[in-house]
């Protein structure tokens, strides 16, 4: 079963669903990577399946969030979108069981 993808705002949804809007706001290279990463999300059955874009925890963000590289210093940020986020015994998010995500941001990586 593919990942369920939601969006934090209508603007983010539009940016992710309209190539023209993405190109206009982010530039062609970043828009192409965004399209590819969204295709990766749609093809994955869980977040743990994601490899491209170097998914990683982001300092200063909620532990249920991951940043995924796009291009030219841009990234998009997803978070687990479960009422009860699956957790490991350690308390960390069990990304192998997360099958619902929300795109919460597209921004320049300031790390």
What do these predicted regions represent?
Residues 1-39:
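Arg/Lys-rich, positively charged N-terminal/basic patches that mediate binding to nucleic acids
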Residues 37, 44, 55-57, 87-94:
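Intrinsically disordered, low-complexity boundary segments flanking structured domains
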Residues 66-111:
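Enriched for short, Lys/Arg-rich terminal
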Residues 43-66:
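A short, surface-exposed loop/turn module that caps and links secondary-structure elements
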Residues 36, 53, 61-63, 71-73, ...:
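Short connector loops at helix/strand junctions that flank enzyme active sites
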Residues 6, 14-15, 40, 58, ...:
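Lipid interaction determinants
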Residues 2-4, 23, 47, 55, ...:
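Generic secondary-structure boundary/loop-capping signal
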């Amino acid at each position: 079963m593919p990942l369920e993808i939601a969006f934090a705002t209508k603007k983010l949804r539009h940016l992710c669903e309209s190539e023209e809007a993405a190109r206009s706001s982010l530039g062609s290279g970043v828009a192409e990577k965004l399209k590819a990463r969204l295709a990766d999300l749609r093809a994955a059955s869980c977040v743990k399946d994601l490899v491209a874009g170097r998914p990683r925890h982001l300092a200063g963000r909620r532990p249920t969030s991951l940043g995924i590289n796009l291009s030219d210093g841009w990234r998009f940020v997803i978070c687990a979108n479960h009422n009860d986020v699956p957790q490991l015994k350690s308390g960390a998010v069990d990304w192998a069981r997360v099958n619902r995500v929300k795109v919460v941001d597209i921004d320049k990586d300031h790390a």
